[in-house]
């Protein structure tokens, strides 16, 4: 019977935006601008690194990989979300829902793994500068990036296959703006729902907490090494190479902890939806801004690469 019920569910209905119908046009315009800025900002970072030879280093290779993961993550969720804001028909096919979950989880976890790799890169650069070229060889960097992407794809496959092997009984309304795990679990039925929920939660928490602890460990060694530098100028210079990455980590895990660790309440549907949207849209939106403004080397390269071409007469005067 469970498999029969499962086979009858051919589509779901996303009702996350129905809690504030009067704001949908304003939200559409706001999210569209943020989405376009996210794409443009990350493409600008990638183009700058590609065109500026001085940025052909492991740190900026990882930054480009991070930009790719952010572009793909937003593309997996936001275009569909924008279409739903303008439509009264918010149904999504079963396979489309599974695909959205797979790609969003894959690129989301890839993003977390790459942030961990970037923390390790900064640890090697500051704590073992003489061995940096050996430890961060081109082959080693490619391996770290490849493992991050492979790990993200494996996580996406594990979570998606676990959720969509469940039986769904009758109800089709997903109280979210995307195909997300908690609202889909509420639609599932059968004796294995609780086991799957605990298993998926354990896998996701273990992966994210492991990444966070590795980043904390890297920065513990980094801070200890920076404090041993005798001059204030040297300490500031060393810390400046980590500032943008550390800020993105705080934003990424800060928003995630507020959303996923806060107590759930049946009366907080609007708040949960808004916080979920904030994490999905605002975090990728802020990331290129942080890296562009807080990374002096990247900021100078952007001005040299693009500003000088747009305003050559000002470049001559400089």
From Swiss-Prot:
Record lineage: Eukaryota, Metazoa, Chordata, Craniata, Vertebrata
Extracellular topological intervals: 1-25, 76-99, 161-197, 260-272
Membrane-traversing stretches: 26-46, 55-75, 100-120, 140-160, 198-218, 239-259, 273-293
SUPFAM superfamilies on file: Family A G protein-coupled receptor-like
Protein's recorded name: Olfactory receptor 10H1
Gene3D superfamilies registered for this protein in UniProt: Rhodopsin 7-helix transmembrane proteins (1.20.1070.10)
Alphabetical UniProt keywords: Cell membrane, Disulfide bond, G-protein coupled receptor, Glycoprotein, Membrane, Olfaction, Receptor, Sensory transduction, Transducer, Transmembrane, Transmembrane helix
Topological domain spans for side Cytoplasmic: 47-54, 121-139, 219-238, 294-318
Protein role: Odorant receptor.
Single GO cellular component term: plasma membrane
Similarity remark: Belongs to the G-protein coupled receptor 1 family.
InterPro entries in the record: GPCR_Rhodpsn (IPR000276), GPCR_Rhodpsn_7TM (IPR017452), Olfact_rcpt (IPR000725)
GO MF entry, a single one: G protein-coupled receptor activity
CDD domains reported in the protein's UniProt record: 7tmA_OR10A-like (cd15225)
Membrane topology note: Multi-pass membrane protein
Coiled-coil regions listed: none
Annotated S-S bridges: 97-189
Location(s) in or outside the cell: Cell membrane
Single GO biological process annotation from the record: detection of chemical stimulus involved in sensory perception of smell
């Amino acid at each position: 019977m469970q498999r029969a019920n499962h086979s009858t569910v051919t589509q779901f209905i996303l009702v996350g935006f129905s809690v504030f119908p009067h704001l949908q046009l304003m939200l559409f315009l706001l999210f569209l601008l943020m989405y376009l800025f996210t794409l443009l900002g990350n493409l600008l970072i990638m183009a700058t690194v590609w065109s500026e030879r001085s940025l052909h280093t492991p740190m900026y290779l990882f930054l480009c990989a991070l930009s790719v993961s952010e572009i793909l993550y937003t593309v997996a969720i936001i275009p569909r979300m924008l279409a739903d804001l303008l439509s009264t028909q918010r149904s999504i096919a079963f396979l489309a829902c599974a695909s959205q979950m797979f790609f969003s989880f894959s690129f989301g976890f890839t993003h977390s793994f790459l942030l961990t790799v970037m923390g390790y890169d900064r640890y090697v650069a500051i704590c073992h500068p003489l061995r940096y070229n050996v430890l961060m060889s081109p082959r080693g960097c490619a391996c770290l990036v490849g493992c991050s992407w492979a790990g993200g794809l494996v996580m996406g496959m594990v979570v998606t296959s676990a959720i969509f092997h469940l039986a769904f009984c009758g109800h089709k309304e997903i109280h979210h703006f995307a195909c997300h795990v908690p609202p889909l679990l509420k639609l599932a039925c059968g004796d294995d729902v609780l086991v799957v929920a605990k298993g998926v939660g354990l896998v996701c928490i273990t992966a994210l907490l492991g990444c966070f602890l590795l980043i904390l460990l890297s920065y513990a060694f980094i801070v200890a090494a920076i404090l041993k530098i005798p001059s204030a100028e040297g300490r500031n210079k060393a810390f400046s190479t980590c500032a943008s990455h550390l800020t993105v980590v705080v934003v990424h895990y800060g928003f995630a902890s507020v959303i996923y660790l806060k107590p759930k309440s049946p009366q907080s549907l609007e708040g949960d939806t808004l916080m979920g949207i904030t994490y999905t849209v605002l975090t990728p939106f802020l990331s290129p801004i942080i890296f562009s403004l807080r990374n002096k080397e990247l900021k100078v390269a952007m001005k040299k690469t693009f500003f000088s071409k747009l305003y050559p007469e000002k470049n001559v005067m400089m």
